[in-house]
Amino acid sequence: MTLTTGVKGLDELLGGGVARGVILQVYGPFATGKTTFAMQVGLLNEGKVAYVDTEGGFSPERLKQMAESRGLDPEKALSKFIIFEPMDLNEQRRIISKLKTVVSDKFSLVVVDSLTAHYRAEGSRDHVELAKQLQVLQWLARKKNVAVIVVNQVYYDSNTNTLRPIAEHTLGYRTKDILRFEKFRVGVRLAVLERHRFRPEGGIVYFKITDKGIEDVLKAKPENGEENI
């Protein structure tokens, strides 16, 4: 069973949507739509959402705007979300552990946005701590049959001249599906499927951020017949 993203292209890219029972990692630079994506999955699907907001990125006003723009009851939408706001890595660990008793069959989604915010602040010695938290999240996904979205940030790797996900190997071991978000041009973002359990890697989908949240970018065919974004 999957949860729709509300974006046809992303659902197809992910093999039907965000899967229950596994962890989806979504990473990319600032302002590429990662938080909006996570909020939208929670908004558009049945069930409660446990949302661990480590960076203060969750906005009730933004969620209400998304709901109203889609003709949904904003207060009802907001009531689905249970928000946790850890201030450091230790509190984050306690909250994630607490989710084992908080998450019931009424929940469909767990979000950690972002998992690595406090990890970055406290240094690279916290690999083991992150691995333990991911182990709990993996248990939640499997035992509670929920989808788990882990948002991750990036750093600049001077050796490869590229942006790489923070704690790449630690997260990569536990996250079965990985989406990378990028800025394509003004008003347009792209999602790249870096890893999936059964879908081919490297697929790309373009999307835009609007009052509704995120939406498909329609391809327009110019006179030469070639498709451009």
Curated annotation (Swiss-Prot):
SMART domains: AAA
Residues the entry annotates as binding ATP: 28-35
GO molecular function, one term: damaged DNA binding
InterPro entries: AAA+_ATPase, DNA_recomb/repair_Rad51_C, DNA_repair_and_recomb_RadB, P-loop_NTPase, RecA_ATP-bd
Keywords of the record: ATP-binding, DNA damage, DNA recombination, DNA-binding, Nucleotide-binding
GO biological process per UniProt: DNA recombination; DNA repair
Record HAMAP family: RadB (MF_00350)
Family as reported in the entry's similarity comment: Belongs to the eukaryotic RecA-like protein family. RadB subfamily.
Function text: Involved in DNA repair and in homologous recombination. May regulate the cleavage reactions of the branch-structured DNA. Has a very weak ATPase activity that is not stimulated by DNA. Binds DNA but does not promote DNA strands exchange.
Protein name as catalogued: DNA repair and recombination protein RadB
